[in-house]
């Protein structure tokens, strides 16, 4: 069960090892972003990789309906979900009825720690990248900033200067950073 923000990357990090281990995989992308995973699965099928028909399946549609069906199905031996806490709770509850193993990554946020001896220009670049990459829509976004009081004001100034250099606009436009 794959989220919308990095649908292909997050799907493949679970699909590849499962296929390598000889497992059949049913992938369910977020209903907002199914195309990249569908295109990848089609490319795998057309490339004649030797993967037997039906070993890799992509199911699209309502997350609640399909996720619930997969989590409770007796033929499902394991579930990997990257998503929100409410979805994780629902999948875990349904899967627990059959004792199906579940691996959850539920959208935690990372922290940046900045100490007094830090290079503040480098720290500002890292902070901006960590929180604003992909518009901050990442489970590991550095959305918490813990800064020693001795460098707080200087770091804020450096962050403002750094983010001021970032072109803002439509995501597919040339040179846009945010």
Give the ranges of each region predicted by the language model.
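ALDH superfamily catalytic-core signature
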Residues: 78, 86-178
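Rossmann-like NAD(P) dinucleotide-binding subdomain of oxidoreductase/dehydrogenase enzymes
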Residues: 1-122
